[in-house]
């Protein structure tokens, strides 16, 4: 049996895996255990009551968290003309068309989010094999293919998170940093859960938000009592 690290021993002693914690208690526990030499991210896993094998029950979308994610997001925009100027004014880090596509083909991808106007998809479409595996391919379902590129840039910069269930029907995303206040993490989590409720597939039956767990980058998951959250859409 593998030897437990000191940190893992402490986590095992502190975290009751059979318990659902009130949100403020859960955050306090995470912050106590976030002892890495860097500021750890706070991540969430939401088990959904869906059959992920059925395409009509898959959940995908994006929402802006009220307090952002604590990360500085670099945004690349494929567009031209007046939209290019609007994107730059909105804070886009890189704006272009064929020239930007050439950078991507060379592996020069110093950005976290890609936005495209519909007329640019003829260029972006050629980059699917590069952007797709990295989760960077623009998609109208998450608002990154849009005629209003300026709004998409502002949303990305403001801390928009994209979500998509995995094959087990679980959503994984980041909702902040370990140095956020408990209230900031709570409000970010509530905003995400409200967005997920709105995205519930009509064919999904029974309890939709089955389990909510939060963790830090290097820590264990802590189950959250949903009764301690305000998720009224």
UniProtKB/Swiss-Prot annotation:
Binds directly to 23S rRNA. The L1 stalk is quite mobile in the ribosome, and is involved in E site tRNA release. Protein L1 is also a translational repressor protein, it controls the translation of the L11 operon by binding to its mRNA. The gene is rplA. Signal peptide: none annotated. Keywords: Repressor, Ribonucleoprotein, Ribosomal protein, RNA-binding, rRNA-binding, Translation regulation, tRNA-binding. Belongs to the universal ribosomal protein uL1 family. It comes from Vibrio campbellii (strain ATCC BAA-1116). One of its GO terms (biological process) is regulation of translation. Part of the 50S ribosomal subunit. Pfam families: Ribosomal_L1. This is Large ribosomal subunit protein uL1. NCBIfam families: rplA_bact. GO terms for cellular component: cytosolic large ribosomal subunit. Gene3D superfamilies: 3.30.190.20, 3.40.50.790. GO terms for molecular function: rRNA binding; structural constituent of ribosome; tRNA binding.
